[in-house]
């Protein structure tokens, strides 16, 4: 039997890695390079990350339908092309800011502007809008990644293998976040933050070449033999395997209209699970570098800062790979239904983020404790994420998977928008109040971080309870 499906899975892994590298450039250059140049506060950064989330959420609603309409191959190509362009455009924000601010005629002059002056406020405001434009383009393209990847997984893998395949490509998020602190801060330090955006953004254009020549539907791919095709279609009640001589249009499934998708509890179960938990991962992704610099004076470009961020995402990467293996074990060894095995695995993984509650208390002993504990919490999220994505394939026909995934990603983006905005305003307020702001023994900004860690720790158990309440038993959607 050929194993072309795993080569396709590796492409999904690389795309997701590039996706998260592009998303991480701003968070790893914000505190040390961009904030001083454009006079940003945490509230400004929170505004950018929260609006990126809402741009992403809105785009996700249509991205799934777009991928279903365009097809996996073209849809994925367009998505990664758009987000790579958006990533590269960030590099021009400094020059563009000088065009709109009187008295500032060069990028070098931006740093020389007196902090707190009217010109500094203008620089901050103009640059925030320019970055938002670039983040909007980035979000528009990135929204297509997971709908296209999940649709590809449903095309190339039987149900019992989908969570494992999803955990592999979803690990790209962890690997991207893992590689980011090793690549991006040194690039920004030695060549400028603009070059970091250009080099990392350019990786997506390279990926497009491989996708163009390697991907095709399994029924049409010359790299997939009949034995592998039969394995892929083992779940079909009536599997029609097209031969080289004929292809039956009867194998096409009827898609569910977008508005009708909202009539199913299965859609709401998936959407609520994403709404409550996606923002936790994005909080770790966007704020971990700033957290280590604020709390431990460890900038992302310093050896300590790089070590802390690398350790965090190394833990995420290694442990999250078991996210897809555990339900596979339940199905093959315990004889459980794939959906029931997934829900049991998700319950187990929902307990992992609780360790984030100890990040701030143990941080008083060593900065390595928060790195380890946030890493464990992030690993729990990635393992959870691999399985929640796969529940869509359990419940919905393949023709609608990208649309449902887009709805869930939209819900996750809305949840993330709320968390990022709350975090940015909370940190700015807590820093300004100092000792007057306190929570559970912490004062000022550390108290703000502890509040956020408390929510992150509890979000997954709340999500699992609500999901199980909506869909207590396996019940696939029937298209009439």
Segments (PLM) and residue ranges:
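Residue-level signature of mid-helix packing/kink "hotspots" within the transmembrane helices
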Residues: 24, 53-61, 143, 177-178, ...
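Extracytoplasmic gate region of multi-pass secondary transporters
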Residues: 26-30, 262-324, 381-385, 389, ...
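Primarily marks hydrophobic transmembrane alpha-helices of the MFS/SLC 12-helix fold
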Residues: 76, 131, 343-346
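C-terminal ends and interior cores of transmembrane alpha-helices
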Residues: 81-124, 347-364
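Cytoplasmic helix-loop-helix junction between adjacent transmembrane helices
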Residues: 134-174
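Helix-loop-helix hairpin linking two adjacent transmembrane segments in secondary transporters
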Residues: 173-222
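Multi-pass alpha-helical transporter architecture, strongest
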Residues: 207-215, 354-362, 449-480
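C-terminal transmembrane helical hairpin of 12-TM major facilitator-type secondary transporters
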Residues: 339-387
């Amino acid at each position: 039997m050929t194993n072309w499906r795993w080569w396709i899975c590796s492409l999904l892994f690389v795309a997701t890695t590039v996706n998260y590298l592009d998303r991480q450039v701003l968070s790893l250059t914000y505190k040390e390079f961009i904030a001083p140049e454009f006079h940003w506060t945490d509230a400004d950064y929170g505004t950018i990350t929260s609006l990126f989330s809402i741009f992403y959420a809105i785009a996700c609603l249509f991205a799934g339908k777009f991928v279903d309409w365009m097809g996996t191959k073209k849809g994925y190509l367009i998505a990664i092309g758009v987000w790579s362009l958006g990533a590269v455009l960030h590099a021009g924000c400094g020059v563009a800011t000088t065009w709109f601010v009187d008295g500032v005629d060069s990028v070098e002059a931006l740093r020389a502007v007196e902090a707190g002056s009217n010109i500094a406020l203008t620089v901050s405001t103009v640059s925030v809008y320019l970055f938002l434009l670039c983040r909007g383009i980035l979000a528009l393209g990135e929204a297509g990644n997971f709908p296209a990847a999940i649709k590809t997984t449903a095309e190339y893998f039987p149900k019992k293998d989908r969570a494992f395949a999803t955990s592999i490509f979803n690990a790209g998020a962890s690997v991207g976040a893992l590689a980011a602190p090793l690549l991006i801060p040194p690039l920004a330090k030695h060549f400028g933050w603009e070059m970091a955006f250009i080099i990392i953004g350019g990786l997506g254009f390279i990926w497009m070449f491989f996708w163009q020549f390697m991907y095709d539907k399994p029924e049409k791919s010359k790299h997939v033999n009949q034995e592998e095709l039969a394995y892929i279609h083992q779940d079909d009640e009536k599997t029609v395997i097209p031969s080289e001589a004929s292809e039956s249009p009867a194998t096409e499934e009827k898609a569910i209209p977008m508005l009708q998708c909202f009539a199913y509890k299965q859609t709401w179960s998936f959407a609520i699970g994403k709404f409550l938990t996606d923002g936790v991962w994005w909080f770790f992704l966007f704020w971990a570098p700033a957290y280590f610099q604020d709390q431990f004076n460890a900038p992302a470009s310093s050896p300590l800062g790089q070590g802390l961020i690398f350790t965090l995402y190394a833990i995420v990467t290694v442990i999250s790979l078991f996210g897809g293996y555990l339900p596979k074990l339940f199905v093959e060894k315990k004889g459980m239904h794939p959906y029931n095995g997934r829900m049991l695995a998700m319950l187990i993984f929902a307990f992992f983020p609780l360790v984030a509650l100890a990040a701030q208390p143990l941080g008083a002993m060593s900065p390595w404790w928060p790195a380890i504990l946030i890493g464990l919490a992030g690993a729990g999220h990635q393992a959870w994420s691999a399985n929640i994505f796969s529940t869509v394939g359990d419940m919905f026909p393949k023709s609608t998977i990208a649309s449902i995934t887009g709805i869930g990603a939209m819900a996750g983006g809305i949840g993330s928008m709320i968390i990022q905005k709350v975090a940015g305003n909370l940190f700015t307020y807590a820093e300004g109040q100092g000792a007057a702001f306190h929570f559970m023994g912490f004062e000022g900004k550390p108290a703000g971080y502890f509040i956020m860690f408390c929510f992150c720790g509890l979000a997954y158990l709340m999500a699992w309870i609500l999901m199980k309440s909506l869909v207590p038993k396996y019940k696939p959607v029937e298209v009439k």
